Amino acid sequence: MSEIKIGIIGWGSLLWDPRDLKISKTKIGNCSQDIWHGGPYLPIEFARVSNDGRLTLVIDEGINTDIQSSKSQTWIAESLLSSVEDARFDLSIREGGEGVPTGHVGITSRNESGINMLIKEWLDGPENTEKFTDLIWTNLEPQSNEPGEKWEYGDRCKYIQSNMENKKLIEYIKKTPPTVRTPIRDYAEKEFGWKQDESYIWDRIAKTIYFPKS
């Protein structure tokens, strides 16, 4: 494959709220929809408190916490940009600004480890190499609302309990794709009945997911 094709890995609000992110669309009915294709399984968890108080999903390998890391399927949209540098900048702007860190793995990448290795192994799959030359993703770390404090399973559960009035927090957890199963999500569903908001269409045969535009 000589043509550069860049895939953007998403797992949270990027899927239902891409804003001005430059990604390919597909015509479904009378609407133009952002289509996300099945991506690699990665250890993601509700582990980062955002500026508006949501408990958002980030890559979390469970290091230095009591949370057992588990892998969930992520999703990939094709960037309309043909430069990895431009696509990473575009993703950073969507995620809050130029300084937001992003990760990158390409078909020519070598000696990867950790998360990069998991993504590279997926990219090296025969059917995936035909689709993409490069993959990028938001590379934010777990972060509590109080820097330096412990941030284990119980702490995150208490954070949710203390912020029940935050509608954005509740909406985020409910809208997260059904393929994301984590200890924190299980807790929210069992404790508060926050079931999956089925505002998406998941085509299991085509291995795609999209959120219809209103």
Residue ranges and their predicted role:
Residues 2-214:
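A glycine-rich, hydrophobic/aromatic-adjacent loop/helix-cap motif
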